[in-house]
Amino acid sequence: MKNISLLGASGSIGTQTLDVLRSHPDQFRLVAFSVGKNIDYAVKVIQEFSPQIVSVQREEDVLKLQAVSGNTKIVYGSEGLLEVALHPDAEIVVNAVVGSVGLLPTLRAIEAKKTIGIANKETLVTAGHLVMEAARKHNVSLLPVDSEHSAIFQCLNGENEKRISRLIITASGGSFRDKTRDELHHVTVEDALRHPNWSMGSKITIDSATMMNKGLEVIEAHWLFGIPYEQIDVVLHKESIIHSMVEFEDRSVMAQLGSPDMRVPIQYALTYPDRLPLSDTKQLNLWEIGTLHFEKMNQERFRCLRFAYEAGKAGGSMPAVMNAANEVAVEAFLQKRIGFLTVEDLIEKAMNHHNVIARPSLEEILEIDAATRRFVMEQI
């Protein structure tokens, strides 16, 4: 029986993580979780899983939950998030929150020697050097939950990572993959939220449409697997059947395939190095699919992917700036305050405005994050 703490239980990854726990009640126990403002959902999860600690975003929601939570301790805010991450009984902390708010809980959980199931891209994007140093220092495993990084991780089982020639990350292309840049001037929030292959939260669905999601994954892969950016490629693959590939020195290529279902990489992170049945996921039938398509990625068409490569190669504080600018811009787009292509423009302005700090401390990263958010908000 593995004890699990789940950060971000009401989001897309969080709800699918609970599906996995539900499927294997003899294998996993939920000891703590966090939610934002979805209190009705939190009540249902408490009633089903009986966790010891639950954290909510706002203090005013604590009393609402306490009235129905029984023996479950209710906490709130950033301190509450840390309490969930540091639950003394938790062996695995699944970080499924959206945005840079996931950074500090991850670092503290690593220091407490928890195994980390990392679904929060922004943690490695904003502070990859700090996270990987901490993981090495405390001998902690970071197990990828993203389908692409899980695919690479699985392809590397039993392999010598020094023999890697290239990582090939696949991209569905998002909801606007067939549109020209001229057509993107007029797209709506509703258009952007219709992803062709995956069921995800609103922020990551917009990131998929801009291709920033893939850019974040490139930076994340750089840190997780220690591969230079020059050896990380992205290929457009509309079917989302091949989740990523690894090319080795002898030009052999290993790929991980499967029907698009986030529960597969989530469960693998929780059961690693073992595997368990996942009977209600769709079996892959290649003869039904017939053909798999691949296209070269155009970084002028998808400028956010180019920004991510530029930020990653610049290093230091630049990825944190790019990430903060993107979070503010995407939120403004979701609120219909800016157009779709303005997201790219705001990120570019923020990156051009910033002077890179080579090895920023945690405090400097948090300051840069806040300053970048203020700068971008002033541009809107």
UniProtKB/Swiss-Prot annotation:
It catalyses: 2-C-methyl-D-erythritol 4-phosphate + NADP(+) = 1-deoxy-D-xylulose 5-phosphate + NADPH + H(+). Pathway: Isoprenoid biosynthesis; isopentenyl diphosphate biosynthesis via DXP pathway; isopentenyl diphosphate from 1-deoxy-D-xylulose 5-phosphate: step 1/6. It is an enzyme of class 1 (oxidoreductase). Disulfide bonds: none annotated. Pfam families: DXP_redisom_C, DXP_reductoisom, DXPR_C. InterPro entries: DXP_reductoisomerase, DXP_reductoisomerase_C, DXP_reductoisomerase_N, DXPR_C, DXPR_C_sf, NAD(P)-bd_dom_sf. GO terms for biological process: isopentenyl diphosphate biosynthetic process, methylerythritol 4-phosphate pathway involved in terpenoid biosynthetic process. 1-deoxy-D-xylulose 5-phosphate binds at K121, S147, E148, S172, H195, S208, N213, K214, E217. NADPH binds at S10, G11, S12, I13, G36, K37, N38, N120, E122, G201. GO terms for molecular function: 1-deoxy-D-xylulose-5-phosphate reductoisomerase activity; manganese ion binding; NADPH binding. Keywords: Isoprene biosynthesis, Manganese, Metal-binding, NADP, Oxidoreductase. Mn(2+) binds at D146, E148, E217. Its EC number is 1.1.1.267. Its cofactor is Mg(2+); Mn(2+). Belongs to the DXR family. HAMAP family: DXP_reductoisom. Catalyzes the NADPH-dependent rearrangement and reduction of 1-deoxy-D-xylulose-5-phosphate (DXP) to 2-C-methyl-D-erythritol 4-phosphate (MEP). This is 1-deoxy-D-xylulose 5-phosphate reductoisomerase 2.
